[in-house]
């Protein structure tokens, strides 16, 4: 998703209409007109292959947006709240407003926040950078829900930031906007090795739980220098969805889960995001009979792209491959997908 703002100088409009959000200032002809275009590809809702890292329509839907501009001292010089109608129509009808008191060669910091309110008392860049996102739980829910709609009211929060020097003529500002959360898809299946060992026996995954996730993250990406100092106590559990597509036996079933989590810095083994699979082993592969079932648990960690690092707007596919029943033997291969780029992690579980 791209957001483009174009500043045109000198001023082309003599005055603003009385209902304009930001009145035209009188400051010696240093005003600039901003022409804002929000670009967001429109795709129809539909079924897709699980684990492809595709960005769904509800994951990039825009309901509201705000543009905030700061001068070099970090003081807010413009805030423009955009309505849903303005945002959705901006590709054909650019949004125009005034950037006051800016001379050529001056540098300005541009920030865009989508699908989230910014309090009126946040009037400096420093205060905006202190803002935290703390509602990660609201993104998660049942598999049926998270794979068909945005669970968070208002949609996925997205932000972008860039610095631009104002030119004497037209200043074009291009900004990349990213979701503040990461996406994790987990698919569990039994391997040929499992079927060789246990014949018709199968494992039915009941629930998958992620834990040790970051409770909060900064609203504005600052990961080049720091992460929000928060606890790693976020936990989310979800019943597994059984995918029987193309399966002739229960030991060929696949089990799917999807979570959204906050960014998290790379960490040593034992401190990364933990994945727990709660399942039952069925000796004869007939899941309708329970006398031959045994509870089993598998544990592993998310490797992220590398070292357990989870990036905002990152997409991670975990292939959990069950080789046995002990839950001790774990091998992971992660694919990082875009959203930014799909990262896949394969993990072999059991012996």
Predicted regions and their residues:
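Bacterial N-terminal signal peptides that target proteins for export
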Residues: 1-5
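C-terminal motif of bacterial Sec signal peptides marking the signal peptidase cleavage site
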Residues: 13-15
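Tryptophan-paired
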Residues: 46, 50-127, 183-187, 191-312, ...
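Residue-level signal for mature regions of secreted extracellular proteins and peptides
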Residues: 9-10
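Short, polar/proline-rich extracytoplasmic segments that appear immediately after membrane translocation
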Residues: 22-27, 304-351
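Bacterial signal peptide processing site
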Residues: 17-20
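Structured interaction patches on ligand/partner-binding surfaces of diverse proteins
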Residues: 86-87, 119-171, 290-315
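A short, Gly/Thr-enriched small/hydrophobic beta-strand-prone motif that recurs across taxa
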Residues: 22-48, 178-192
């Amino acid at each position: 998703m791209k957001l483009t703002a174009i500043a045109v100088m000198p001023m082309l409009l003599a005055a603003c209409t009385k209902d304009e959000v930001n009145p035209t200032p009188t400051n010696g002809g240093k005003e600039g007109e901003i022409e804002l275009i929000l670009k967001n590809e429109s795709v129809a809702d539909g079924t897709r292959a699980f684990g492809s890292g595709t960005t769904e329509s509800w994951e990039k839907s825009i309901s509201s947006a705000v543009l905030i501009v700061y001068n070099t001292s970090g003081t807010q010089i413009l805030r423009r709240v955009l309505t849903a109608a303005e945002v959705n129509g901006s590709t054909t009808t650019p949004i125009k407003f005034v950037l006051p008191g800016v001379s050529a060669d001056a540098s300005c910091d541009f920030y865009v926040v989508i699908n989230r309110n910014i309090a009126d008392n946040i009037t400096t860049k420093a205060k905006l950078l202190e803002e935290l996102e703390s509602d990660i739980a609201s993104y998660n829910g049942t598999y049926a829900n998270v794979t068909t709609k945005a669970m968070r009211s208002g949609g996925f929060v997205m932000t972008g930031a860039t610095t631009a020097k104002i030119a004497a003529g037209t200043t074009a500002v291009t900004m990349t906007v990213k979701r503040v959360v990461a996406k994790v898809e987990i698919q569990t299946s039994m391997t040929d090795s499992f079927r060789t060992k246990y014949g018709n026996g199968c494992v039915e995954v009941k629930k998958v739980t992620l834990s040790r996730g970051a409770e909060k993250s900064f609203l504005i990406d600052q990961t080049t220098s720091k992460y929000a100092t928060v606890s790693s106590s976020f936990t989310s559990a979800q019943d597994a969805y059984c995918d029987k597509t193309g399966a002739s036996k229960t030991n060929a079933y696949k089990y799917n889960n999807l979570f959204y989590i906050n960014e998290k810095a790379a960490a040593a083994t034992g401190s990364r995001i933990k994945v727990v699979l709660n399942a039952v082993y069925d000796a004869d592969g007939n899941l309708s009979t329970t006398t031959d079932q045994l509870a089993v648990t598998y544990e592993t960690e998310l490797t992220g792209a590398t070292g357990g690092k989870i990036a905002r707007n990152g997409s991670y596919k975990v292939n959990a491959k069950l080789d046995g029943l002990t839950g001790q033997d774990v091998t992971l291969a992660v694919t990082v997908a875009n959203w930014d780029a799909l990262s896949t992690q394969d993990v072999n579980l059991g012996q």
